[in-house]
Amino acid sequence: MEIHQITDFNAPELDVYARLTENQLVNRADPENALFVAESPLVIGRALDAGCAPVSFLMEQKHIEGKGAALLARCPDVAVYAAELDVLTQLTGFHLTRGMLCAMRRPKLRDPAVLLQDASRVAVLENVMNPTNLGAIFRSAAALGMDAVLLTSAGSDPLYRRAVRVSMGTVFQVPWAYLSEGWTELLHTLGFRTAAMALRDDSVRLDDPRLAAERKLAVVMGTEGDGLADATIAACDYTVRIPMHHGVDSLNVAAASAVAFYQLGKPAE
């Protein structure tokens, strides 16, 4: 294992961690070299467990033989950049990383039809834009029995650094894929019934027994603020509301997803 000492925050080796934007990391012009950054030993470990390929590590010097040692032992041929804390604290948000970051190659996108073959409970996210919300939804999906998360392409990227961080690495544990136009038809063709989370006069309560009884169910959540598109609601089999108190009519999409997944996800063993 070759360790490179970094003493200057402006060193080019830090570009991927400190200066490249999320869009530059995605590198749509050269997807084979697209990257994402994982933070903290727990999250990096989950990414490695999922088969993500590391490109380099960046960590505080003391962690090389400390809490980073086990991860580095799994990747003996990967470059390691180490620096003292006074250099690394110039990285925005470094205090959230638990002293360790890893640049990794983006995995190839999955085919949603293949992903859904063995699934019975899935989440569909239509244009969820906030990476924090997205990460929280993935964490709830992992904890509360959802087999997969499907996303429309206009929404946030599950591999954005903030989404990965908030998810606690569950974006590497719950399979996900992007949907194309006509996705409700795809779900119906594969035997799924679709439940749109929306406030409508014809909506059913989340605890309606018909929902939990469905053999295959897709829980469809909408964008922050505006919620689901009218056309999406019309194309779904159910429109579903969460019963609430004190005149509150809605929850943040991340909070609503946790409630919905708890009620409709696969029961824990």
Q: What is each model feature region?
A:
Residues 100-102, 140-144, 153-172, 230-269:
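Structured adenosyl-cofactor binding patch, chiefly the S-adenosyl-L-methionine
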